[in-house]
């Protein structure tokens, strides 16, 4: 089985078109793309409500509502004129085999990065970030992590495949440096001695966006950054369609402003995870995820215009 393939390989969970109706390219390694979008339809590491495997399809589906705006407000330029972005479809793996998914995703990412591409990935549950971090660390070395979430995902339970343990495992493997990493929007219990800077939801909601961004920049410094956004960072009023919703989160407006504020960081990889459309209302969670993903691409495109 190939790592990537035609859409019929994952016909139960895949689309026939790309994010923002961007070109589909099932062999992106030799393409001239700057950024490659990969869907990872996986939710076997979920502890709460399952259904994240349908997240990539939902994000792509609702992104058609964003494709019409060329000079996007407030950027006032067309990202597609500055970045060559392709969608390579979904990772193909034997459903039910978490280890195969992890190994194939890491291999796919390593091949893309070796070819000079950058990755924007759609989960799937948050475990998919760990094989992506492994691939990125091989290419870029130890990185800083900027992590939006309701949970720190630093829990040590001894389980190999768990969407709540990646950021316990990643520092131990030398993939990320907790002392230069920040977790934003947290509002569940966590270990305060793991080295990460935690900006909990109360702090982030009560402080100005500029103040939060200034602290993030100070923590990260000039390190290569991996940006991961768990959609449950948003309050369930804005993102009900997720496996482990927690009230008291960020508004979609504040989240977008925070992502825009990361423009000056050296971001080398990005993902949006944990969209579970079965629990969504009027596709608002998928729309939030698609919009945040688009903003992530815009902060990359903005650098090319400077």
UniProtKB/Swiss-Prot annotation:
Which cofactor is essential here? Answer: Mn(2+)
The Enzyme Commission number assigned here is 3.5.3.11
A Gene Ontology biological process noted in the UniProt record is: spermidine biosynthetic process
Where does the source fall among the domains of life?
Answer: Bacteria
What Gene Ontology terms describe what this protein does at the molecular function level?
Answer: agmatinase activity; manganese ion binding
Give the keywords, sorted.
Answer: Hydrolase, Manganese, Metal-binding, Polyamine biosynthesis, Putrescine biosynthesis, Spermidine biosynthesis
Q: Where does Mn(2+) bind?
A: 126, 149, 151, 153, 230, 232
Task: Give the matching CDD domains.
Answer: Agmatinase_PAH (cd11592)
Q: In which pathway does it act?
A: Amine and polyamine biosynthesis; putrescine biosynthesis via agmatine pathway; putrescine from agmatine: step 1/1
Q: What chemistry does it catalyse, as a reaction equation?
A: agmatine + H2O = urea + putrescine
* PROSITE patterns noted in UniProt: ARGINASE_1, ARGINASE_2
Which family does the record assign?
Belongs to the arginase family. Agmatinase subfamily.
Query: What role does this protein play?
Result: Catalyzes the formation of putrescine from agmatine.
Spell out the HAMAP family in the cross-references.
Answer: SpeB
Q: What is this protein called?
A: Agmatinase
Give the originating organism. Escherichia coli O9:H4 (strain HS)
């Amino acid at each position: 089985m190939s790592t990537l393939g035609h859409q019929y390989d994952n016909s139960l969970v895949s689309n026939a078109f790309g994010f923002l109706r961007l070109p589909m390219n099932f062999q992106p390694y030799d393409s001239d793309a700057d950024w490659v979008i990969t869907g990872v339809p996986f939710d076997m590491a979920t502890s709460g409500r399952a259904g994240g495997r349908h997240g990539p399809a939902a994000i792509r589906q609702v992104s058609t509502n964003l494709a019409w705006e060329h000079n996007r407000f407030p950027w006032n330029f067309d990202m597609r004129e500055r970045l060559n972005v392709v969608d390579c479809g979904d990772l193909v793996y034997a459903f039910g085999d978490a280890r195969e998914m992890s190994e194939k995703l890491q291999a796919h990412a390593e091949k893309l990065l070796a070819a000079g591409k950058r990755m924007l990935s759609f989960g799937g549950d948050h475990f998919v970030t760990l094989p992506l971090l492994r691939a990125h660390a091989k290419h870029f070395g130890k990185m800083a992590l900027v992590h939006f979430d309701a949970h720190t995902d630093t829990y040590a339970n001894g389980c190999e495949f768990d969407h709540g343990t990646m950021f316990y495992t990643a520092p131990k493997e030398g993939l990320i440096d907790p002392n230069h990493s920040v977790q934003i929007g947290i509002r569940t219990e966590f270990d305060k001695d793991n080295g990460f800077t935690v900006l909990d939801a109360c702090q982030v909601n009560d402080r100005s966006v500029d103040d939060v961004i200034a602290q993030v920049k100070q923590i990260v410094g000039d390190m290569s950054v991996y940006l991961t956004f768990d959609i449950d960072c948003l309050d369930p009023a804005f993102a009900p369609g997720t496996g482990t919703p927690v009230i008291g989160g960020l508004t979609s407006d504040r989240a977008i402003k925070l992502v825009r504020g990361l423009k000056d960081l050296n971001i080398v990889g990005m993902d949006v995870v944990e969209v579970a459309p079965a629990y969504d209302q009027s596709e608002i969670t998928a729309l939030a995820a698609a919009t945040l993903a688009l903003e992530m691409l815009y902060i990359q495109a903005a650098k090319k215009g400077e």
